[in-house]
């Protein structure tokens, strides 16, 4: 895991398997089926990395031999909240890692001026949970900021929120950091820039279209 000195709350997950799978996802000739499978696999690997610092406590239990105080994750179960629609492709990988997690959804689409328009919010109870928001792309950063806003408006502390994405543009990371410096953003790659259409370069295209086999 590495950091970029420009963005204190950005963490780049540079594990070789993550980078290898991301390269295959970038390839324009990768099929919808393979893209979908890779998204699940890479999200599972990234989820393993970002959950390493979850708060722990102990629980008294009995093994076949003795009683012990065994380490367990503290608080309520994790909540996974994909940002629709592309984020839903990441939830399977996270649920494979944490099958007992609660799942919410935040639906956002991008208007012509690239600003987010919210159309759906469904969340589990919020108290004492750690939330993982997920969306494959942080391009302009507006949708990611909006998703965090949704949780913070409901009194979820920034320290209890993580945002997980595959690729991000520096422009979007700056917007995110300015809005939510207390929320950690985890990505597989910090790419070069946004083009005139607000697509990440080199990026991987429209993640939603490639995930679901649709045309923009």
Curated annotation (Swiss-Prot):
InterPro entries noted in UniProt: PRibTrfase_dom, PRTase-like, Upp_B, UPRTase/APRTase, Ura_phspho_trans
Pfam families, per database record: UPRTase
Regulation: Allosterically activated by GTP.
EC number: 2.4.2.9
GO biological process: UMP salvage; uracil salvage
Residues that hold 5-phospho-alpha-D-ribose 1-diphosphate according to the record: 85, 110, 135-143, 206
HAMAP family hit by this protein: Upp_B (MF_01218_B)
NCBIfam families: PRK00129.1, upp
Record protein name field: Uracil phosphoribosyltransferase
Source organism (scientific name): Paraburkholderia phytofirmans (strain DSM 17436 / LMG 22146 / PsJN)
Gene: upp
């Amino acid at each position: 895991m590495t950091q970029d000195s420009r963005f204190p709350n950005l963490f780049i997950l540079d594990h070789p398997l993550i980078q290898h799978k991301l390269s295959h996802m970038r390839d324009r000739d990768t099929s919808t089926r393979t893209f979908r499978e890779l998204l699940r696999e890479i999200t599972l690997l990234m989820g393993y990395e970002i959950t390493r610092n979850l708060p722990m406590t102990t629980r008294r239990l009995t093994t076949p031999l003795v009683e012990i105080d065994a380490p367990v994750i503290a608080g309520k179960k994790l909540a996974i909240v994909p940002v629709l629609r592309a984020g839903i492709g990441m939830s399977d990988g996270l649920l494979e890692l944490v099958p007992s997690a609660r799942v919410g959804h935040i639906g956002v689409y991008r208007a012509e001026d690239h600003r987010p328009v919210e159309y759906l919010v469904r969340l589990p109870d919020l108290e004492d949970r750690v939330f993982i928001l997920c969306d494959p792309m942080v391009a302009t950063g507006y949708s990611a900021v909006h998703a965090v806003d949704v949780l913070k408006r409901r009194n979820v502390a920034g320290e209890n929120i993580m945002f997980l994405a595959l690729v991000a543009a520096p422009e979007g990371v700056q917007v995110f950091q300015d809005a939510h410096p207390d929320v950690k953003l985890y990505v597989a790659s910090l790419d070069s820039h946004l083009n005139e259409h607000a697509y990440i370069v080199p990026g991987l295209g429209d993640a939603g279209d490639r995930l679901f086999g649709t045309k923009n």
